Regions:
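Conserved nucleotide-sensing/catalytic segment adjacent to the nucleotide-binding pocket
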Residues: 46-106
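Hydrophobic positions on the alpha1 helix immediately C-terminal to the Walker A/P-loop
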Residues: 34
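Conserved lysine of the Walker
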Residues: 31
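P-loop (Walker A) phosphate-binding loop of NTP-binding proteins
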Residues: 26
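ATP-dependent NMP and nucleoside kinases share a basic, alpha-helical "lid"
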Residues: 93-140
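Active-site signature of alpha/beta-hydrolase-fold catalytic machinery across serine-
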Residues: 37
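NTP-dependent small-molecule kinase module
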Residues: 1-15, 118, 139, 161-206
Length: 206
């Protein structure tokens, strides 16, 4: 994780003064946990969770809201204010600030969608097969969320069929018993190859 944090810090800004980093993957693939650990390694970098931007009525049709509430202010170097969605109350809450920190993480399914990629400094993909990820997510959320998952899975299938993220990922992350394994992704550059190569052994784990 230290190597990834070092790589991100040295990147040029991508969204105003911010290095915006997307963490994408199938639901249940471990995005939130990974983003939280990466944020800590970055000294407390802000994390925008797309669960706060999406809603029951707009599982994936939230691009306009994200652009207006978050991306456009950050591009101006201003603090963004977004209204997080309350999934229990089924309504948006009071605005929450998101400062233009040197690195800001955007975590959630669809973080690497086409409309957002021009604003990203890097895109990370959690490398876990979708069926395995969905099984993990169902187990995590329990029987009470069965109906939600029954609707979510076909919606996620449609989203990635129309707007795939993985082919544009700079880095692939696999969670193992000893930590995270990191490999250059399909869109990886020489910088990823320098920091993360399959032959690096322990240096590719964190």
């Amino acid at each position: 994780m230290h190597a990834l944090a070092a790589l991100l810090r040295r990147l040029p800004p991508s969204c105003g003064p911010v290095r915006l980093v997307g963490v994408d993957g199938h639901a249940g693939s471990g995005k939130s946990t990974f983003a939280g650990r990466l944020a800590a390694e970055l000294g407390g970098a802000p994390v925008l969770r797309l669960d706060d931007i999406a809603s029951h009525d707009e599982l994936f049709d939230w691009t306009g809201r994200l652009l207006s509430q978050v991306i456009e202010p950050l591009e101006r170097g201003a603090t963004a204010h977004y209204a997080p969605y309350d999934w229990r109350a089924r309504r948006f809450g009071a605005p929450r600030p998101l400062p233009p920190a040197p690195v800001v993480l955007v975590e959630g399914v669809g973080a690497g969608r086409e409309a957002l990629r021009p604003h990203l400094a890097r895109l990370v993909w959690m490398e876990l097969p979708r069926e395995e990820a969905w099984a993990r997510g169902r187990a995590r959320d329990g029987a009470g969320q069965r109906t939600f998952w029954d609707g979510w899975i076909p919606a996620e299938r449609r989203h990635f069929a129309d707007d795939p993220s993985r082919p544009f990922a700079h880095l692939l992350v696999r969670q193992g018993e000893k930590g995270y394994e990191m490999l250059p992704g399909p869109a990886g550059t020489a910088l990823e190859a320098l920091f993360f190569t399959q032959g690096d052994g322990p240096s590719a784990m964190c």
